């Protein structure tokens, strides 16, 4: 079994507005191993996106903890969490969130700039990642000049440019047609094999989830089962 990279211990999340309490996550516990490809499957409103926000240190659980590489996130300062997100975690969303006035190369380079890497390293690494996703020939094109599938590939290159140990992906193919969605998941698998990056993908699509090595089901804020989707039609 691979070394545990990320572990959730009894995560709960409650929102309160006035006297109204809404429990979104209930005692969620699971782990992700080094280099693992894992999916969490659930319908809209099941708590998947809230869970990813907690895993990435973008929000704080009401109770429970997230442990990344043996270090509890509850003990990290805001600055330390930001550094963790920049250096060790990658994020992919349903919408690409590319900066419209920047080229593909400049968008991919942004995490390196934030991480204060050397200028020569920034350009070469960003171009290397664009080549890895098959878009080095589109390096100087802005998002408006790219197709939907190309924009999502640029977003994936940006997520991986700092060579993170884990990528958190929230419905990464939700805005794509079937052909482009298939292409994106093939790309994630290839990057996993080449770089050893672990991926945790949340999705409602069983056909896409079955591409991952392990699948968990989430309903109403609870992990209810480990699924067996290999060969599912």
Swiss-Prot record:
GO biological processes: lipoprotein localization to outer membrane; protein localization to outer membrane; transmembrane transport
Highest taxon listed in the record's lineage: Bacteria
GO cellular component: ATP-binding cassette (ABC) transporter complex; plasma membrane; plasma membrane protein complex
Cysteines paired by S-S bonds: none
Matches recorded under InterPro entries: AAA+_ATPase, ABC_transporter-like_ATP-bd, ABC_transporter-like_CS, ABC_transpr_LolD-like, LolD_lipo_ATP-bd, MacB-like_ATP-bd, P-loop_NTPase
Domain ABC transporter: 6-233
EC number: 7.6.2.-
Family membership noted in the UniProt record: Belongs to the ABC transporter superfamily. Lipoprotein translocase (TC 3.A.1.125) family.
Subunit architecture: The complex is composed of two ATP-binding proteins (LolD) and two transmembrane proteins (LolC and LolE).
Protein name, as recorded: Lipoprotein-releasing system ATP-binding protein LolD
Name of the coding gene: lolD
């Amino acid at each position: 079994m691979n070394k545990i990279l990320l572990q959730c211990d009894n995560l709960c999340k409650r929102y309160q507005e006035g006297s109204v309490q809404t429990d979104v996550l209930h005692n969620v516990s699971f782990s992700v191993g080094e280099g693992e490809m894992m999916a969490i499957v659930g319908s809209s409103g099941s708590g998947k996106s809230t869970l990813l926000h907690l895993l990435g240190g973008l929000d704080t659980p009401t109770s429970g903890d997230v442990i990344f590489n043996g270090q509890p996130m509850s003990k990290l300062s805001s600055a330390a969490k930001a550094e963790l997100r920049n250096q060790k975690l990658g994020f992919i969303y349903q919408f690409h969130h590319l900066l419209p006035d920047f080229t593909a190369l400049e968008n991919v380079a942004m995490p390196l700039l934030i991480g204060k890497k050397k200028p020569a390293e920034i350009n070469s690494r960003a171009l290397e990642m664009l080549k890895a996703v098959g878009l080095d020939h589109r390096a100087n094109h802005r998002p408006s000049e790219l197709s939907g599938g190309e924009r999502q590939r640029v977003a994936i290159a940006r997520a991986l440019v700092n060579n993170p140990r884990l990528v958190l992906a929230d419905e990464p193919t939700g805005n794509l047609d079937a052909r482009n969605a298939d292409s994106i998941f093939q790309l994630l698998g290839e990057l996993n094999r080449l770089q050893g990056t672990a991926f945790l993908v949340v999705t409602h699509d069983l056909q896409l989830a079955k591409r991952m090595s392990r699948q968990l089901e989430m309903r109403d804020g609870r992990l209810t089962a480990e699924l067996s989707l290999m060969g599912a039609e």
